[in-house]
Amino acid sequence: SITSLEGEKVDKLFFRDEALANKAKNYLKSNSFFIRKIDERTISRKPKAPFNTSTLQQTANSQLNFSASQTMTIAQGLYMGIDINKETIALITYMRTDSITLSKDSIDTIRENISKEYGDKYLPDKPIEYKSRKKNAQEAHEAIRPTDISIKPDDIKDFLNEEQFKLYDLIWKRTIASQMTSAETNQSTLQIDCEEKNITLKAILGKLI
């Protein structure tokens, strides 16, 4: 990303017209660049909570480009059941909920799956508990999760349409990740200058440990 142009700091609103954008583009094409400084650090990212209705809609919109109503329609189908090997199987729990909590039984099953499939390296010493910050949250239901965490998305891909697969995959991965250890990332920040000193850049590279 560009951090400065002709000595002026660049922020999100900097490129207010096409002329500025073209100027930056020309500098990028005509200059020779070199790395001035490298900063390295380790970042720990805690897992996100399981989905409730609003976070499922938001994430499906940002990652899958599904509208809120589209997400709920697909989720309804997964909740009502999918025909798999001549049997109708409900794949997710009730999709209208404010809750981000999971039952003890489901947490135990998820942790067993993590240990078996990924190894104890990715399993915290204790279960991770999530509580809603929203006052008066309707928590009669659990968070949205697969009814059977052992049913992997790829195992049932042939029985789902494309949209169903994408949403189930999203829910399954979020549920598994919610009970895993924090992700450790080695992050390198590169400060990049040019010989003409009319534009500076920053690049951030990350690698999971």
How would you label these PLM feature ranges?
Residues 1-209:
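Core catalytic DNA strand-manipulation module of type IA topoisomerases
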